[in-house]
Amino acid sequence: MGCIKVISVFLAAVAAVDARAFFHNRGGNDVIPNSYIVVMKDGVTAEDFDSHISSVAATHSLNKAKRGSETVGHKDSFNINGWRAYNGHFDEATIESILKDDKVNYVEHDRVVKLAALTTQPNAPTWGLGRVSHKAPGNKDFVYDSSAGQGITIYGVDTGIDIHHSEFAGRIRWGTNTVDNDNTDGNGHGTHTAGTFAGTTYGVAKKANIVAVKVLSAGGSGSTSGVIKGIDWCVTDARSKNTLGKAALNLSLGGSFSQASNDAVTRAQEAGIFVAVAAGNDNRDAKNSSPASAPAVCTAASSTIDDQKSSFSNWGTIVDIYAPGSNILSAAPGGGTRTLSGTSMASPHVCGVGAAMLAQGVSVAQACNRLKQIGNAVIRNPGTGTTNRLLYNGSGR
């Protein structure tokens, strides 16, 4: 993706500053006022980073006193496989100062991120598992390798997960929460996606371990910086438990284009975590959405029971694979089930099959390519420039 590094709100104020330090978020009206993500150049040391943060804190305090600003300054720092960044709440004068530091790569607005699910249809049939394990449609049986993701850890970065649901018994733990103080799934979206990627009944990788990472509220929204903080936690956790190379991460969420979001998932993938991402539900080119537009991850578009593109699904050359996403039955908080539609439902199918492949010895670096190689070329009207490959687990059926 090309970087046109400009922040429009500072055109006059920062005209004399090196243009390489600016970045413009393409499209969208979801900017969080006065909130920014600052990304450092590769090779910046921990000492240089800490020195920069201290300098920013001093500048922010000075500008706050001088102008009566109500901004809160630096909030969280991130280090994802050597990718250093931070977010904060700053006035324009402080951002102008930040952009003058030659250690800064770019700055972008923090933005609202939302889940990628649509409608609920009561009592709809469950069909996705049968479809991804057969070359032809209409089969209800799910055929899969008996390893079923055993030994793999899947991070559900979402609205949280009901860790007491019987679908996940003995295989789940709570990870972290970057959005609020409520360590439950008040929305149900995260429980549903987890049920698809690793539930005992409705899941693809039925023996995988699960970690709940909450980055979206009960209302289904969060921030780019909150998602990045969650991803940072996942990489740190996997490294501490020596599971890099044996881990997957599902992101059934998205927002408008964000280079920081794309960089974060890319570094997570490079660290050794298979990343599956929802393409989005706007029936437009997914190149305008993040983190779906990150080339390094496995981006999933949504298909229907009759092997067509779901009407809502994003499309485009950035899409790696189609997967079942319309009317998918899975787990719901409180022990029940519900049916949802969206690319949010397609992504966990991809995540689950990817995790199962990792358990069989496929590398993180090759997993998405393998999915594309064996996918069935059956999707009708996939969209301009979009693959017609449908997810297949290689069962031989």
Curated annotation (Swiss-Prot):
For this protein, the record's Gene3D superfamilies field holds: Peptidase S8 propeptide/proteinase inhibitor I9, Peptidase S8/S53 domain
Q: Where is the active site?
A: 158 (charge relay system), 189 (charge relay system), 344 (charge relay system)
Keywords annotated in UniProt: Glycoprotein, Hydrolase, Protease, Secreted, Serine protease, Signal, Virulence, Zymogen
What are the protein's GO molecular function terms? serine-type endopeptidase activity
User: What is any one GO biological process for this UniProt entry?
Assistant: proteolysis
Question: Which residue ranges does the record assign to the Peptidase S8 domain?
Answer: 126-397
Spell out the InterPro entries in the cross-references.
Answer: PCSK9_ProteinaseK-like, Peptidase_S8/S53_dom, Peptidase_S8/S53_dom_sf, Peptidase_S8_Ser-AS, Peptidase_S8_subtilisin-like, Peptidase_S8_subtilisin-rel, S8pro/Inhibitor_I9, S8pro/Inhibitor_I9_sf
Q: What is its EC number?
A: 3.4.21.-
Propeptide positions in the record are 20-116
Q: Spell out where the chain is glycosylated.
A: 250, 393
Q: Where is this protein found?
A: Secreted
Indicate where this protein is primarily found.
Answer: secreted
Q: What induces it?
A: Expression is strongly increased during growth on protein-rich medium. Expressed at even higher levels when keratin is present in the protein-rich medium.
Its function? Secreted subtilisin-like serine protease with keratinolytic activity that contributes to pathogenicity.
Q: Member of which family?
A: Belongs to the peptidase S8 family.
Name of the protein this chain belongs to? Subtilisin-like protease 3
**Organism of provenance:** Trichophyton rubrum (Athlete's foot fungus)
Where is the organism placed in the taxonomic lineage, from the top?
Answer: Eukaryota, Fungi, Dikarya, Ascomycota, Pezizomycotina
Gene name, Swiss-Prot/TrEMBL: SUB3
